[in-house]
A protein has these predicted regions:
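Conserved catalytic SET/PR domain of SAM-dependent protein methyltransferases, capturing the structural core
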Residues: 1-154
Length: 154
């Protein structure tokens, strides 16, 4: 697997592989491209990113973006026009790169992919089950980061 010089993949106990910044990034800077092909839910792997009601970006190859873990206080967002991961704020070298899975995934329970979040942020959602299970208030807080298909169902 190719890992760009500006990124580093490290195995973390209890999390698996995690992606880290190998240099400083400025807010709004593109970190990396979300690669793969569009598949239906029935064909997608657990690492796929949901971009539509039944559309997932997935690949038969392992890409470095598969190592981006969830956080309720993420450092990255997906720019859905360019399909790039973009810095939400300034990121320091050595910091873990994360995005909020609730901004793309509608129902993780359906495929038994829900999990207890370990991000430790004060705004932690706890059990990550998917956008479907959030309160209206929680959904509205995530609105600026949401995949377009989720914005439509708000």
């Amino acid at each position: 697997m190719y890992i760009p010089k500006h990124l580093k993949s490290i195995k973390i106990k209890g999390k698996g592989r995690s992606l880290f910044a190998n240099r400083n990034f400025k807010k709004g800077e593109t970190i990396l491209k979300l690669k793969g092909v569009i598949k239906k839910c029935s064909e997608a792997t657990p690492d796929a990113v949901q971009i539509g009601e039944d559309e997932f970006i997935d690949s038969k190859y392992r890409y470095v973006e598969d190592h981006i873990n969830h956080s309720c206080n993420p450092s990255l967002k997906i720019d859905f026009d360019s399909m790039n991961f973009v810095a939400l704020r300034n990121i320091k070298r050595g910091e873990e790169l994360t995005y909020n899975y609730l901004t793309t995934e509608y129902d993780l329970v359906r495929d038994n992919l829900d999990f207890d979040c370990k991000c430790g942020s004060k705004n932690c959602f706890g059990r990550i089950k998917g956008f479907k299970f959030l309160t209206k208030t929680q959904k509205l807080k995530l609105k600026p980061l949401l995949a377009p298909y989720l914005k439509k169902i708000l």
